[in-house]
Amino acid sequence: MDFEKIREEKIRFFEDHHTIVIATSHDNKVTARTVSYATEGLDFYILSWEHHEKIQQIKGNPNVALARDNISIKGVAQILGKPTDEKNKRGAEAIKKKRPKEFEMFSRIPGMIMVKVTPTYIKSWVRVDNRFFIEHLDLEKRQAYLQKPDE
């Protein structure tokens, strides 16, 4: 499989959507919730209040999972800080482009922070010639391959 082609397909898919489920965990407690996001390439940018449970869990364990439709993602979250800080300009621009009203409304609220999720692995169900496969996109190894569901 062509790694870059599959990667570009995923980029386009996530550009066309606005919400995703993020699962976070710490001290053997896992929680999940739907969040709004924007992407730059395959990096996801999310706004949240710093006191929210997901942020506290990310502080203790940056490994997260994202899910949308038939796609699941393993990734690493990084708390960037205030969305209006100069150092967060890339993420802020991505959110402004995709969700300008949301950025304007939430970015200046005290306690609002930006989180960046960098995917490491993407797995999805795909159909090829009327047969279902699990498509793997290993972003760390830069590999893409199909797997039969019964393997």
Question: Which sequence ranges carry the predicted segments?
Answer:
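Extreme N-terminal tail/first-helix region
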Residues: M1-T19, E140-E151
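A generic structural signal for short, non-catalytic loop/turn and secondary-structure boundary residues
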Residues: E15, K59, L66-R68, S107-P110, ...
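Short N-terminal signal/transit or membrane-insertion segments
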Residues: M1-I11, S48-I55, K59
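A generic secondary-structure signal marking the coil-to-beta-strand transition
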Residues: K10, H18, L42, G111-I113
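Charged, gly/pro-rich active-site loop segments
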Residues: S72-E151
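Short beta-strand segments
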Residues: H17-E50, I55-I58, V64-R68, V76-Q78
